[in-house]
């Protein structure tokens, strides 16, 4: 699915500028990966790379290699990969097509441009809107939606494409914690049924801790750690947002002798 081996990208002519990497990532079909880091960590740059936007990055491969869904990491453009890779970003209104006058047409826009038969387009639209709880919005204009409604519709647009890789780049920023949990449970169901791999890019450990099997920590473009939750928690950069109680606990406990099970994290995040 995804294999990045020592991959480092940046500017060959300006080696002192921001670099991303070296990155070592292995993601299998159906797996969920959380990429955690603060502002400026390189999360969105990595998201664009994974989505297939290499040609828009204007960067160079400085070291290593990468394969994403069987393709070299530096091949093609975003639109060439849209049928199998979907990237949902933080600002939903910027992701609307701008040429549809209803939510139903917006969700149908992508599948229709794949040249699918009308019955298949309609099935995908119906399934995706039901999954994202936005059937009641079908006749609304996309630009009349609230922030939370718009994010659910953009997620429906992505799922209607039936992707093999779904990249969620702070895609729940306008949803409440409860609504975020609901949406992620729905996406988990889709992932289990389709084999779609999911990557969450977040500043917060919540909600990724509840849904992801693997975690990658980024700080100023550097990969600090990658592995299961208990393996990466001791390496969390200060700019990853935690509750004060959890951060204090991580500072005093010895990770070699005290594992951090998900039950412990759920207790800390019960306040959310």
Regions found by a protein language model. Name each.
Residues 162:
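Conserved catalytic motifs of ABC-family nucleotide-binding domains
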Residues 237-272:
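ABC ATPase nucleotide-binding domains
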Residues 202-203:
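H-loop/switch region of ABC-family ATPase nucleotide-binding domains
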Residues 91, 99-112:
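Q-loop/switch helix immediately C-terminal to the Walker
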Residues 222-245:
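Conserved beta-strand-loop-alpha-helix hinge in the C-terminal portion
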Residues 119-137:
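Conserved ABC ATPase "signature" region
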